[in-house]
């Protein structure tokens, strides 16, 4: 088991913003990368997706745990790998919960497709053409964004949509807008300033 260090924003901003290269040979190194990504995701039990750039490997590989729900009320399936994933169709855009292991404790509401058709290779190196719907589509879209250096904060439309989640005395999650935490109006601060 090799859990790798997850890059954090803004410290590792340059690496997280870099675009990833396609996998051209499905070999032992690719298999090891997939295992490292899975081990890293499993070690971070609150995560449902991880992209290779988040462990400082700029290859087009993502790991996702499907069948999760945005409120965390259902345990996700075991992680699967998508290699060289390419979105061929997207639709049904909606606002939904978004977060990222590279931004610990920071969450937001973003607009993402709730329908995706994706082609690529599975973890055996075999081609796939797969449809993802609902929150699964949100997760897959988020992870594919990482491969192009796009981060979830880039998709935040309003400062008020960015928040931290705390657990109250009853053990229930409470969303606190970042604007309340930093104590300044949205005119005085950009979303990227909060993340940095």
Where do the PLM segments sit?
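Active-site rim/adjacent substrate-binding subdomains
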Residues: 1-141, 146-196
């Amino acid at each position: 088991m090799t859990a790798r260090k997850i890059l954090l924003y803004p410290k590792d901003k340059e690496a997280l913003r870099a675009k990833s290269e396609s996998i051209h040979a499905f070999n032992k190194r690719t298999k090891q990368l997939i295992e490292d990504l899975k081990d890293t995701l499993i070690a971070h039990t609150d995560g449902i997706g991880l992209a290779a750039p988040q462990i400082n490997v700029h290859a087009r590989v993502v790991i996702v745990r499907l069948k999760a729900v945005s409120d965390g009320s259902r345990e996700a399936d075991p992680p699967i790998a998508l290699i060289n994933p390419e979105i061929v169709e997207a639709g049904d855009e909606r606002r939904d919960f978004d977060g990222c292991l590279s931004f610990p404790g920071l969450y937001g509401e973003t607009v993402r497709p709730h329908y995706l058709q994706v082609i690529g290779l599975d973890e055996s190196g075999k081609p796939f053409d797969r449809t993802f719907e609902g929150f699964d589509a949100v997760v897959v879209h988020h992870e594919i964004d990482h491969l192009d250096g796009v981060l979830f904060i880039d998709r935040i439309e309003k400062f008020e949509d960015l928040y931290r989640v705390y657990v109250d005395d009853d053990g229930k999650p409470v969303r606190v807008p970042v604007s309340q935490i930093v104590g300044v109006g949205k005119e005085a601060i950009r979303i990227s300033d909060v993340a940095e």
